[in-house]
Amino acid sequence: YIWSRRIFKKKLSNKNNIVIALDRDSKTLTTARKLTKEFKDRFIFVNEKFSNIDKLKFSNRNLKAIIFDLGYSINQINDLEKGLSFNSKGKLNMRLGKNLISAHDVVNKMPYEELSKVFRYFGEEQKSKIIAKNIINIRSKKIILTEDLVNIIENIKKKHSKINKSTKVFQSLRILVNNEISQLMLGLINSFKLLPIGGILAVVTFHSIEDRIVKFFFKNYSEDKKNSRYFPEIKKNKKIFKIINKKPITPSKNEIILNPPSRS
């Protein structure tokens, strides 16, 4: 919502330009209607994963920029039905689309070894093994609500830390449930294929795992490229990215105060 409004206000003085916004969460349609009402047919909302951006029917010759905002909206975080946040008291769901598996399924059914790896690799949680072990021991009673999981984590992580003790575990579950890693990689690859010469690709990340993938992608598809087994090989004389910002742009102290989630 904020990105689209800013683009219209700052960049799209030409009334022939349009914004096409993608979101896999169907509830975003409510917000999208506000923009449609304000900007008419210059704003188009598509209820779709951004990994499927290549399936949209538009001429890539007229495509000027693609922006990925990998964070969750305040509405999504506060939605008790989604159970995305450790600060909300809702069911352990975390699904943004028509996913078959919920966070409840993962926490209550996944074997110890796999659960421990999820916390370790997707959340970089140092106490992944002991948290997974305690979940296994407790889940015979069923772990249903977000606060049930928070209580397990807080009983293990006693020491005070700069971030909430549940941050990494909840992050890892969101990544797994919504298949975020492969969605991001596919979205980046398909964007590269779509963008014409001179097109812009900007990505807003919110944690180190996303950040590493994006940096790796740009390095692989830039002037300093080295072919990678994780991304398709670029043939010689093909278009490549010119990296504008060698270092990521991070939020100011004032922005963090106004928008705490941006601290990531």
Per-range role (PLM):
Residues 1-264:
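S-adenosyl-L-methionine-dependent methyltransferase catalytic core, i.e., the SAM/SAH-binding region
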